[in-house]
Amino acid sequence: LDAAEKMKQEGVTHVVLLPLFPQYGIETTGRAIAHWEALIKNHEIAARPTTAIWEFASNDKYVEALNERIDQGLQRFPRKARPDVTILFAAHGTFVGDSKDNKDPYCCLVHHTVDRLMQKRNHDHAFKLSFVRDGGWGTSISIDLKNQFSDLARAGKRAVLVVPVDYVTEQFDTAYMLDVKARTEAEASGIAYYHVAAGLNCHPLFIEGLTDLVVESIVPSSKKPEMLCVEACPRTGWHGKDEPEGDKCSVCPFLSNPKENKTARPSQRHGSLSTASTRDPVSRKS
């Protein structure tokens, strides 16, 4: 409401909504945009011509910024350990259940980000993807993440670089979870070298990517939003809850015909313990 009041004072006539969640999720981007719509519907803020940026999971500059953070993170390991570092991508686990029940595209989009990153790196390191929360926004570490550390140690992988893949800033709770609690679990499992890549924060390429997205959203285009995964189309008829914040977004971009979109290979694969030099990335399995 404070932002809306400031917009009124400054004479803003058009709005671009840019939720800072790279991967669309019903309970993140969807909830944020639905809340904005509810404020307008309830006449709490003025209606203005509005466009929204739904996701940027595979945006080139976002991916390149993440790639640079990986390079920087690898430099923190002893030189002799760098070739054997496993990249462990860390994503929220809170909404994965919704991906199954509501066909939320979140999980699939996370995989697309990881795939794009590892393709850019030519699969130069072994990698895994872990969802770090079993549910809720607390600081409890998921069983999945604990198991990942144990599996890596048993496989002789004792150097791990954790890369936050759907966190764009270093929030206190996230930093504490990954750099303190997860480190304790990793060391207890036998991981000898453990580092967490820096968040994107104000990385120049990331900011450029966001700028490009905003410009593209206000330039007239005949291009329709694309759905990255054939299973990602959320169900229709989301509205109906009493609380405005609980509404699902009414204009999700993932409602196109699935037959017209490319099929992704979502969720079955969470990485590879082999690098490109020893294994074809197309054939990797969980």
Whereabouts are the PLM-identified features?
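Extended amphipathic ligand-handling, pore-lining, and cofactor/metal-binding catalytic surfaces
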Residues: 1-286
